[in-house]
Amino acid sequence: MSLEIVILAAGQGTRMRSALPKVLHPIAGKPMLGHVIDCARQLQPERIHVVIGHGADLVRERMAADDLNFVLQAEQLGTGHAVAQALPFLSADQVLILYGDVPLIQLDTLQRLLAQVTPDQLSLLTVDMLDPTGYGRIVRDDQGAVQAIVEHKDATPAQRQIGEINTGILAVPGKRLADWLGRLSNDNAQGEYYLTDVIAMAVGDGLVVASAQPLDAMEVQGVNDRMQQAQLERHYQRLRAEELMRQGVTLLDPQRLDVRGEISVGRDVLIDVNVVLEGRVVIEDDVRIGPNCVIRDSVLRRGAVIKANSHLEGAELGEGSDAGPFARLRPGSVLGARAHVGNFVELKNARLGEGSKAGHLSYLGDAELGANCNIGAGTITCNYDGANKFRTELGDDVFIGSNNSLVAPLKIGDGATTAAGSTITHEVPAKNLAFGRARQKNLENWKRPEKIKK
């Protein structure tokens, strides 16, 4: 059967106390709405319709994609009214209704829900709660069949004792939806058009109302304030940490890892505390990551080591290479096999060949280094003239003395050496020694200045 999905994302989120629309607040670095859309896409629907209201332009701008149809709900008059805004665009056999502020919903749960939908049967997602205050209750008959959903404010004292609640997630036969929505009334305590009233209508029309429950109740936890957002963030991170450990990663403290992207890991990886992984990160076998590191959109080849307090973005570390502590590798940085970048070294768009080393206190930008080069402490590539960037190219086996300024554009040949304290402005041929400093002079019997007596 064909499927279309409606995601309700029009709410203001007053309790978030933010100018940002609630559904754009992040979980693991991605807008909550983005998590819901990603899950919805895995169901391969004909179309995904996103109902927007508060902050509509910003939501549309941030989440724009070819497979999304944004539908405006100018006035927020309830969930039933919100779904009705998408009716002109719906033609599928099944319609699944999701929520942009319920970001942890899982594919397996939705598949089980949809499997129960037929032309004469709809299915809703429920969950049992110890404290169901504020939620709509699932009312069943003596045989256990769902009869209705009663919102908390409209519930009788007896109905408020019910622990099974409505999550709001619902899958219905598409051809029935327009009729039900057209019959909704706002004659209730909230003065809104409740989507949940569809359940009683379906029962009255002789349809069966099936139900399913998620394996983890946190899947259907919504976000209304910053505390709930933080709860879901930690729960999500716990799930990601457990997933990594099942794949053979040792986490010294699973509660002190943040994963904010798509991570691929090998076996026997060790990750210390307070590590943040963002974007697309590939970590091969036997990699070691020290504490307090941030790694974004990077590739760590087999046996690479990242030492404490290092920051990598758009970088690649070759097999057996290492960086840190306190190293910064910016986009375009590549370390060859067994290359080494030490403390307080910054690379930007720089490649170090196999076995090359920059041990400490250096900046290498827009540079290409061959194999087995040694960069002395305090060396910088002067790559910017205030208007344009220029490259520095070193051959194999180059030795750069300490405290060198390499003024680009510059080429230094294989096996060349530069003296400590040099400013190198011209090409250095292979196997040459280059001095780029003033000759030392010693003044005999020099007397230091004395303070003037006042």
Swiss-Prot record:
Residues 227-247 are annotated as: Linker. Pathway: Nucleotide-sugar biosynthesis; UDP-N-acetyl-alpha-D-glucosamine biosynthesis; N-acetyl-alpha-D-glucosamine 1-phosphate from alpha-D-glucosamine 6-phosphate (route II): step 2/2; Nucleotide-sugar biosynthesis; UDP-N-acetyl-alpha-D-glucosamine biosynthesis; UDP-N-acetyl-alpha-D-glucosamine from N-acetyl-alpha-D-glucosamine 1-phosphate: step 1/1; Bacterial outer membrane biogenesis; LPS lipid A biosynthesis. GO terms for biological process: cell morphogenesis; cell wall organization; lipid A biosynthetic process; peptidoglycan biosynthetic process; regulation of cell shape; UDP-N-acetylglucosamine biosynthetic process. Its EC number is 2.7.7.23, 2.3.1.157. UDP-N-acetyl-alpha-D-glucosamine binds at residues 8-11, 22, 73, 78-79, 99-101, 136, 151, 166, 224, 330, 348, 363, 374. Mg(2+) binds at residues 101, 224. Residues 248-454 are annotated as: N-acetyltransferase. Keywords: Acyltransferase, Cell shape, Cell wall biogenesis/degradation, Cytoplasm, Magnesium, Metal-binding, Multifunctional enzyme, Nucleotidyltransferase, Peptidoglycan synthesis, Repeat, Transferase. The keyword DNA-binding does not apply. The active site is at residue 360. Pfam families: Hexapep, NTP_transf_3. It is found in: Cytoplasm. GO terms for cellular component: cytoplasm; membrane. It catalyses: alpha-D-glucosamine 1-phosphate + acetyl-CoA = N-acetyl-alpha-D-glucosamine 1-phosphate + CoA + H(+); N-acetyl-alpha-D-glucosamine 1-phosphate + UTP + H(+) = UDP-N-acetyl-alpha-D-glucosamine + diphosphate. The keyword Cytoplasm applies. Acetyl-CoA binds at residues 377, 383-384, 402, 420, 437. Its cofactor is Mg(2+). Residues 1-226 are annotated as: Pyrophosphorylase. It comes from the Bacteria. Binds 1 Mg(2+) ion per subunit. In the N-terminal section; belongs to the N-acetylglucosamine-1-phosphate uridyltransferase family. In the C-terminal section; belongs to the transferase hexapeptide repeat family. Catalyzes the last two sequential reactions in the de novo biosynthetic pathway for UDP-N-acetylglucosamine (UDP-GlcNAc). The C-terminal domain catalyzes the transfer of acetyl group from acetyl coenzyme A to glucosamine-1-phosphate (GlcN-1-P) to produce N-acetylglucosamine-1-phosphate (GlcNAc-1-P), which is converted into UDP-GlcNAc by the transfer of uridine 5-monophosphate (from uridine 5-triphosphate), a reaction catalyzed by the N-terminal domain. Homotrimer. This is Bifunctional protein GlmU. The gene is glmU.
